[in-house]
Amino acid sequence: MKKAIIGRKVGMTQIFDEKGKVIPVTVVEAGPCVVVQKKTLENDGYEAIQVGFDEIREKLANKPRKGHFAKAGATLRRTLKEFRLDDISQYEVGNEIKADVFGAGDKVDVSAVSKGKGFQGSIKRWNQQRGPMTHGSKFHRAPGSMGASSDPSRTFKNKRMPGHMGSVNTTVLNLEVVKVIAEKNLILIKGGIPGPNKGTVVIKDTVRA
């Protein structure tokens, strides 16, 4: 059965396995999330659950959001996400989803908005090669040719050029859950995940299982 939860990236640390080997892990505060709405085949044409995360004060929500949460009988949340799961019959509006839906050894996909790097050149942004730094060269970190001359007389779409780097939704696949601390709603995931500390992350069962 597929599982999913919304969380907040706390940061990275390291733990030791039973053989004393160091394992780098990312700590995620996962949930508690509340089921705000159920989408059904009859009403919506597909089955899914809508989940809210991160409680907020009433003054931070507009009237439509307040009404949406009041209908569900749930407290106001900052983040809303929709998950298409195999079987939504076990979920009811108002139910809580906590970190213990996952267990040690589970394989997950983690999605988050990557760190923004601002405007960057093509060397940093696309890992292009630079020119010679000495021997009379005047070409160092410039992007180089944009394309051919009279034919086609334009730069092709998607040409790798300098521009805004980062701040895009990124997914890392097939990461391992090392440990779940249910009483603190913490999930420890092996390796790094996208985004800054305190950023919102979505954890789902991996598609590569």
Curated annotation (Swiss-Prot):
Residues 128-154 are annotated as: Disordered. Keywords: Ribonucleoprotein, Ribosomal protein, RNA-binding, rRNA-binding. The keyword Ribonucleoprotein applies. Part of the 50S ribosomal subunit. Forms a cluster with proteins L14 and L19. NCBIfam families: L3_bact. One of the primary rRNA binding proteins, it binds directly near the 3'-end of the 23S rRNA, where it nucleates assembly of the 50S subunit. GO terms for cellular component: cytosolic large ribosomal subunit. Belongs to the universal ribosomal protein uL3 family. One of its GO terms (biological process) is translation. Signal peptide: none annotated. The keyword Cell inner membrane does not apply. Gene3D superfamilies: 3.30.160.810, Translation factors (2.40.30.10). One of its GO terms (molecular function) is rRNA binding. It comes from the Bacteria. This is Large ribosomal subunit protein uL3.
